[in-house]
Structure formats: structure tokens, C-alpha cells
């Protein structure tokens, strides 16, 4: 093993380059945006992690419905609720329970 490798450049493999960079990516959607997408399966590989953005003023019911839809389509759903919009522990407990 050498510290400086001045030999031939290594051949690109499926895990390097742009393909490797994009492998395992995640996205974030808002319920109102998700409502405009007919079929996420046509856009994203199965198993993609999809964060559900909690936007102040959007009802929790819309957030949970979006999460259920994406989960049913085979995506790994992750609710993303910022601490600043959670009023108290009871609200946090309620939101977590709704997602379970």
C-alpha cells in the first residue's frame, strides 16, 4: 500500500461516481405536494426514505394520510416535525401515536 497512488486510475464501479452518490438518497414531501403526484412508484425506487414535512398550519390528519399512502406504496416513511411547532409533550405524544 502506498500513500500516493500515481498508477492507473481505477475503473468506475456501480458504487462510485454519480450513481454511487445518488444511491440511498432520501427526499422530503409536503402533503399538498404529494397530493399532486398520482404515483410515487413511477418516480422513486421502492424503499426510498421519504420524509413528511410538517409545515405549520397543515393539519396533522393530512400529514398522517400522506405517510400512510407512501408506506402502502413501499416507501420508508419518516415524519419530520420541527420542535418549534410542537406546543407541549401531549401534542408530541399524540402525533407519535397517530403515526404508529
Regions found by a protein language model. Give the residues of each.
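Alpha/beta catalytic barrel-like cores
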Residues: 2-99
Amino acid at each position: 500500500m502506498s500513500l500516493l497512488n500515481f498508477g492507473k486510475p481505477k475503473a468506475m464501479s456501480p458504487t462510485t461516481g454519480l450513481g454511487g452518490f445518488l444511491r440511498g438518497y432520501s427526499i422530503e414531501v409536503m402533503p399538498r405536494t404529494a397530493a399532486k403526484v398520482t404515483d410515487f412508484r413511477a418516480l422513486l425506487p421502492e424503499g426510498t426514505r421519504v420524509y413528511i414535512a410538517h409545515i405549520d398550519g397543515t393539519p396533522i390528519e393530512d400529514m398522517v394520510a400522506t405517510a400512510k399512502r407512501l408506506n402502502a406504496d413501499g416507501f420508508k416513511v419518516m415524519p419530520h416535525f420541527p420542535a418549534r411547532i410542537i406546543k407541549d409533550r401531549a401534542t408530541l405524544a399524540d402525533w407519535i401515536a397517530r403515526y404508529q
